[in-house]
Amino acid sequence: MQVLLARLACPVYQCFHAIKIKKNYLPLCATRWSSTSVVPRITTHYTVYPRDQDKRWEGVNMERFAEEADVVIVGAGPAGLSAAARLKQLAAQHEKDIRVCLVEKAAQIGAHTLSGACLDPRALQELFPDWKEKGAPLNTPVTEDRFGILTEKYRIPVPILPGLPMNNHGNYIVRLGHLVSWMGEQAEALGVEVYPGYAAAEVLFHEDGSVKGIATNDVGIQKDGAPKTTFERGLELHAKVTIFAEGCHGHLAKQLYRKFDLRANCEPQTYGIGLKELWVIDEKKWKPGRVDHTVGWPLDRHTYGGSFLYHLNEGEPLVALGFVVGLDYQNPYLSPFREFQRWKHHPSIQPTLEGGKRIAYGARALNEGGLQCIPKLTFPGGLLIGCSPGFMNVPKIKGTHTAMKSGILAAESIFNQLTNENLQSKTIGLDVTEYEDNLKKSWVWKELYAVRNIRPSCHSILGVYGGMIYTGIFYWIFRGMEPWTLKHKGSDSDKLKPAKDCTPIEYPKPDGQISFDLLSSVALSGTNHEHDQPAHLTLKDDSVPVNRNLSIYDGPEQRFCPAGVYEFVPVEQGDGFRLQINAQNCVHCKTCDIKDPSQNINWVVPEGGGGPAYNGM
């Protein structure tokens, strides 16, 4: 990381960057390759360039060790850990021997977890009724709930009436990474085998097409794609049922959508990018238990988004603040990170932060599509839970409780099928269709159905304010029972307009006290990857970023990425520019895979243990 930051701070880069800021965009004539230029090789990953055609891999032992389990779970977030714990609870209750293995790409459980987070404890209460006695880190009950609309200089308070989605009575402000870490301890105590630092890289299939399990990724590969002397093949984990709990926009779930056509009867998912910071503030300004949400400035009415500011009771005057931007925005000049930094200077926000110290930063994509965008959840040999398919209640700004409940229901359905000797599957991998049926009968489905029209109502000519009017009238009157369902308008990647049709956005320079630059922010995420490995941000075509994205959209990847992964720099020989991928900076948010207008970027897992090292984010 230090080497990377030094390189990005070099005079050549700063000079180029200064020119770019001044002009706001590169002249279109400068973005194309000259006739004498050669497109430089960017992607070296074996998912794009198969190793069986590479002489450097001749003679390398490619055998993989395999382990058998009853259930394999990919992802140690709230959903995956809920499923794992519930399976072992049922096994103990019924005196059954069920082996449950859970793999997590982060070096430690909770290190890749990021959320606001204001937690509805309903699912936690179901899973661990004695969570208080067990010491679950829910230290801050909500004591004050505020909502407002921001103009450039003012905050217009909006009352939160009982029954509206934003009401947080009975909820807790939590550091979700700490809660996930605690859940991991409970799961291990129940007998779950938890393997942090193992990144699931491949879905394995039986000959009949059902899911057989997963394989973790290979390690010990050079940046140019050649094997190191330390090369080790990944591990195979086989199971009767594999649960995919990867979180929002999981890279294995993407493969499963295509393989089993799981999205045939739902709308394309729509997403947001959430950026978050932790601050230690002046104790005189600290209001433990206060929850504050806003919409409006600095975003225009056609750009969905908003903010949160939570006062935690963690033994020190700590606040969690963040900003969410809907990834269906249209202006390629928009930078979610810089909108976040600008928001902190609002007269209603800045006084809270003055005299304080920023101690952490991170970002993660989130599902915003709601009920209309939930895919088919089961397939032979596996199923999807949590934020992977997307159970977030968008107007409530909460998805942890619904993710946990989906994991609980999946575990109960799997247990019934594993222990029912009269139930035979037509395929080798069990198809647990009962899970989707049970989910649709649960409070999760009822909750999501009630708010299904709120997010798409923001697509009107009035934008976000039209959505607020809709919520105030129709949700208040019908409580989600209106006899229609609004639709979203296509994929987020299709929403960008050409740069020539948009106005460049002038962002103020960060002051280093309230607002900050991108690289110093990434440094606070603890992000680190093995430098000498192929970039896990792979491109289907190395020429597309310059010939299409830069030429038409002024290179939006250099703005929508909240970690400075993508840069357009001058080519070493010839005219024009090339895309540079700083994979070491990646915080695993998945925004690039979602928003790339060419859908040319494919995010795959790096070596296990790499990525951010969040501490209670």
Swiss-Prot record:
It comes from Bos taurus. It is an enzyme of class 1 (oxidoreductase). Disulfide bonds: none annotated. Accepts electrons from ETF and reduces ubiquinone. Its EC number is 1.5.5.1. FAD binds at residues 71-85. It is found in: Mitochondrion inner membrane. GO terms for cellular component: mitochondrial inner membrane. One of its GO terms (molecular function) is metal ion binding. [4Fe-4S] cluster binds at residues 561, 586, 589, 592. Residues 109-130, 428-447 dip into the membrane without crossing it. Residues 1-33 form a transit peptide. One of its GO terms (biological process) is electron transport chain. Monomer. This is Electron transfer flavoprotein-ubiquinone oxidoreductase, mitochondrial.
